[in-house]
From Swiss-Prot:
Pathway: One-carbon metabolism; tetrahydrofolate interconversion. Homodimer. This is Bifunctional protein FolD. Gene3D superfamilies: Leucine Dehydrogenase, chain A, domain 1, NAD(P)-binding Rossmann-like Domain. Catalyzes the oxidation of 5,10-methylenetetrahydrofolate to 5,10-methenyltetrahydrofolate and then the hydrolysis of 5,10-methenyltetrahydrofolate to 10-formyltetrahydrofolate.
Length: 308
């Protein structure tokens, strides 16, 4: 994996997640071509969308485009909003059994009458390329062969490229969600960091953050992390995303993260911006997970640098 492209602003290095994600997608495309040339195998990703949520339709379109661009087969299944659980599960069972499908994801949210946890549990853990199942969470926590949730995996890739080694680094993850905080902490622990998970009940949160060589913020509270919370020279990964009124353009909005960027950039050694930092890594890692799942399904060596 090449080092993430960076830009200099004040004292901090700005980690260009968009450029890094493009590099990951390029590596995935190379692995896909080798699977085709050497083994006659084309990785396949199936995406299931229930209903007509506009944002979900945009996300599914982006995933389809990215899948095709790296040479994989994209299977799209769009179901009406009143689809029953039985019918949804019948489709998932069919995809689980299809040897041409190596990765399956159901785009969330689903309509209220469907249960997201039951839906994730129905997907074969070997094809759970979103890394959301309790099976993959358990494998990750026990050091097993898991498919890892895409956003934490993307953050780990950025951090590995930033440091020669993560071993011995003090890392603080703000946020304890099953989707991000917990798997992020497990990944950092797996790379021999000393990890603290902070959350809404953490006492003296700012003091806890000031000890971190690596600070990962994922709580969804706009600009909560101030510049004086950050250890000088620390690497800051901002996973939060909030839409707020634009200060200079009445009636317009802008995206900001959990970290007060203008303050943090003068203190941190390196930082991911919002937007353009962590976000682009998510779909790139979804593609990487699909290649990994394909290789595992066929008993082939996994692509180096694209897994945890």
């Amino acid at each position: 994996m090449t080092e993430p492209q960076t830009n200099r602003t004040s004292g901090a290095k700005i980690i260009d997640g968009k450029a890094f994600a493009a590099d990951v997608r390029g590596q995935v495309a190379g692995h896909v071509q080798r699977l085709k040339d050497e083994h006659g195998i084309t990785p396949g990703l199936a995406v299931v969308l229930v209903g007509e949520d506009p944002a979900s339709e945009v996300y599914v379109s982006h995933k389809h485009k990215a899948t095709v661009e790296v040479g994989m087969t994209s299977f799209e299944h769009k179901l009406p909003a009143d689809t029953s659980e039985d019918d949804l599960f019948a489709l998932i069972d069919k995809l689980n059994a299809d040897p041409a499908v190596h990765g399956i994801l159901c785009q969330f949210p689903v309509p209220d009458h469907l249960d997201e946890r039951r839906t994730v549990a129905r997907i074969s853990p070997a094809k759970d390329v979103d890394g959301l199942s309790v099976t993959n969470a358990g494998l990750l926590s026990s050091g097993g062969e898991a498919l890892v949730s895409c956003t934490p995996l993307g953050c780990l890739m950025l951090l590995r490229a930033e440091f020669d080694s993560l071993s011995g680094k003090d890392a603080v993850v703000i946020g304890r969600s099953n989707l991000f905080g917990k798997p992020m902490a497990q990944l950092l622990l797996g790379d021999n960091c000393t990890v603290t998970i902070a959350h809404s009940r953490t006492k003296d949160l700012a003091d806890v953050c000031r000890r971190a060589d690596i600070l990962v913020a994922a709580v969804g509270r706009a600009e909560m992390v101030r510049g004086d919370w950050i250890k000088p020279g620390a690497t800051v990964i901002d996973v939060g995303i909030s839409r707020v009124p634009h200060p200079d353009k009445p009636g317009k909005t802008k995206l900001i993260g959990d970290v007060h960027f203008a303050e943090a950039v003068d203190v941190a050694g390196a930082i991911t911006p919002v937007p353009g930092g962590v976000g682009p890594m998510t779909i790139a890692c979804l593609l990487a997970n699909t290649v990994t799942a394909c290789c595992r399904a066929h008993g082939l060596d996994e692509p180096r640098g694209l897994t945890a």
